[in-house]
């Protein structure tokens, strides 16, 4: 169930900072029916590194963390990402005792909730061609150029939507490519 929030204040974009609340992004969780198969896809097709191989999490600690969210939160989980990205990783989760569903088949990119995961590459043409050779399904027919950022969209075998981003100015964050 979604909550509501209203501060009654306008939101400033640049220069605003709320102290001691959020200090960084931790990870993006991806729920899959087979953790090992998903790790193979992210490693062999996308080239991500396995930073923590699949392991089973169960018992009181995980029940205390997630027991109100999932009837039996026992899971097999792994972490994939890039070695120098710190906490910016994908947490790959397979719930072992609760059957999930393919909600993505009925979802649209514009639905509320998690929309997509952004990945950066140095050569979008070469990366897209390589992923197409590996059988990745792209959602758009080509490559767009928007605000000095080149993009293309694809989906993984479990319906998670990804955007590939090539920055024109690698030294800047992707959202600060324009002047």
Which role fits each region the language model picked out?
Residues 76, 116-118:
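A short acidic, glycine-rich active-site loop
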Residues 95-98:
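Short, solvent-exposed aromatic-acidic interface loops
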Residues 1-21, 30, 53, 90, ...:
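Vicinal oxygen chelate
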Residues 105-110:
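Long, charged/polar, surface-exposed segments that mediate recognition or autoinhibition
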Residues 23-27, 111-116:
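Short, solvent-exposed beta-strand edge segments and adjacent coil->beta transition regions
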Residues 31-87, 126, 133, 145, ...:
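Core segments of cupin and vicinal oxygen chelate
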Residues 88-91, 113:
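Protein kinase-like catalytic core scaffold
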């Amino acid at each position: 169930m979604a909550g509501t929030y209203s501060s009654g204040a306008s939101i400033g974009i640049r220069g605003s900072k709320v102290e001691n609340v959020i200090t960084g992004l931790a990870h993006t969780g991806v729920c899959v029916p087979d953790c090992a198969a998903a790790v193979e896809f992210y490693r062999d097709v996308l080239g991500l590194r396995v930073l923590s191989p699949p392991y089973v999490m169960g018992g009181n600690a995980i029940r205390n963390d997630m027991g109100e969210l999932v009837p039996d939160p026992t899971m097999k989980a792994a972490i994939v990402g890039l070695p120098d990205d710190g906490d910016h990783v994908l947490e790959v989760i397979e719930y072992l005792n609760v059957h999930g569903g393919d909600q993505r088949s009925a979802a649209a990119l514009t639905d509320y909730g998690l929309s997509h995961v952004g990945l950066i590459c140095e050569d979008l043409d070469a990366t897209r061609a390589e992923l197409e050779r590996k059988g990745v399904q792209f959602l758009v027919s080509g490559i767009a150029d928007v605000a000095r950022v080149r993009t293309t969209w694809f989906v993984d075998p479990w319906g998670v939507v990804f955007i590939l981003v090539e920055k024109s100015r690698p030294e800047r964050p992707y959202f600060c490519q324009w002047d």
